[in-house]
């Protein structure tokens, strides 16, 4: 199921959602221009430094030494040099492809404005970043030996989706359903988002059970799960913004 738009009304202008959209797209364009001008190797080197590498975090927490229980798992995989903790933040502003950034920004556009309307601009930004952090931590804890840089705003946006699930469960979402034939249908948000979460959880569980490769399979399902759960919890902890109707702010 692919969400296309929702019918939840908002009062305020989603300035922070717009800023996040512009920032993520702008940084991806920087990555793309780096590839065009200097080759794929330059972009890969940039991503290895600023992407989240769980094995690098594990080694950092072990004081710079590879723990014995990871030696066998790592095998011949090389842990790239770079900061260990900074990528928990920087990785959520990087993306792997045009499809990756478009899909993430589309979801943010659909669900972010209403959550921002509820929380206020800066509380919304704080929650976005915390959900991204939660997604990164979850991914790291369940992939301690992974040497593949994880990038993307998916954990943060999953958190916004989790918050939307709590705030607007009955809002209708126009959804593209590619089942035998492609058709469009309005579905309750709790159905669309609940289905998405179950798919991410089952995919993450299946990958964890079946994969013997510490580099992972390229999709950080557990970051999605961790971010979504963080959004479910945090939206209940953060106060809603005072209602201001003048000037649409």
Language-model segments: which ranges?
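A detector for small-residue-rich transmembrane helices and their helix-helix packing motifs
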Residues: 1-249
């Amino acid at each position: 199921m692919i969400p296309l738009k929702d019918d939840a009304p908002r009062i305020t202008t989603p300035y922070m959602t717009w800023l996040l959209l512009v920032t993520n797209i702008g940084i991806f364009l920087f990555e793309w221009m780096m590839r065009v001008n200097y080759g794929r190797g330059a972009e890969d080197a940039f991503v290895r430094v600023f992407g989240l590498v769980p094995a690098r975090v594990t080694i950092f927490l072990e004081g710079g030494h590879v723990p014995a229980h990871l030696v066998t798992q790592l095998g011949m995989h090389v842990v790239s040099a770079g900061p260990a903790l900074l990528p928990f933040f920087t990785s959520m502003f990087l993306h792997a492809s045009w499809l990756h950034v478009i899909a993430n920004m589309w979801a943010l556009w659909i669900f972010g404005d209403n959550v921002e309307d509820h929380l206020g601009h800066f509380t919304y930004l704080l929650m976005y970043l915390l959900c991204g952090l939660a997604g990164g931590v979850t991914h790291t804890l369940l992939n301690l030996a992974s040497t593949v840089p994880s990038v993307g705003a998916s954990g943060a946006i999953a958190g916004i989706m989790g918050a939307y699930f709590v705030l607007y469960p009955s809002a209708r979402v126009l959804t593209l359903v590619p089942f035998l034939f492609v058709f469009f249908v309005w579905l309750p948000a709790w159905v669309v988002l609940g289905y998405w979460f179950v798919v991410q959880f089952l995919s993450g569980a299946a990958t964890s059970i079946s994969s013997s490769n510490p580099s992972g399979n390229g999709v950080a399902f557990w970051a999605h799960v961790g971010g979504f759960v963080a959004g479910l919890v945090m939206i209940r902890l953060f106060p809603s913004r005072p209602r201001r109707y003048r000037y649409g702010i």
